[in-house]
UniProtKB/Swiss-Prot annotation:
InterPro entries: Ribosomal_Su5_D2-typ_SF (IPR020568), Ribosomal_uS9 (IPR000754), Ribosomal_uS9_bac/plastid (IPR023035), Ribosomal_uS9_CS (IPR020574), Ribsml_uS5_D2-typ_fold_subgr (IPR014721). It is found in: Plastid, Chloroplast. Keywords: Chloroplast, Plastid, Ribonucleoprotein, Ribosomal protein. This is Small ribosomal subunit protein uS9c. PANTHER family: RIBOSOMAL PROTEIN S9 (PTHR21569), SMALL RIBOSOMAL SUBUNIT PROTEIN US9M (PTHR21569:SF1). Belongs to the universal ribosomal protein uS9 family. The gene is rps9. GO terms for cellular component: chloroplast; cytosolic small ribosomal subunit.
Amino acid sequence: MSVQKMMPIINYLGTGRRKSAVARVRLVPGNGEVIINGLPGTNYLQFNGSYLSAVRSPLETLGLEDNYDIIVKAVGGGLTGQAEAIRLGVARALCTIDTSNRHPLKKEGFLTRDSRVKERKKYGLKKARKAPQFSKR
């Protein structure tokens, strides 16, 4: 039986959240492919250019768009929430690669978690804040 030495696969991890979407992001040295839940990024994000540019924007800020493949497991929320969660996860993963990446990413706002979530409905109201129509008589 031969013993093979395997080269360790270098990957950098980052987790992003937005609304109810959670994205677990892996950056692997590659040529700039985006794979989300086993599908090519263009297919998963329905060929929407703004979603794709949001996902790639942290890499483009640092000029590394052709150096790393983005592999994502995204759950919850819709496409917008998932795309922005992926963006945060990519930015966090880039910070683990090199701490000098943190300043330009922070300056662009990629490391800030958007904390806005849907407000809960209250009893006695129709929605979170919408009250039933008031009738004086």
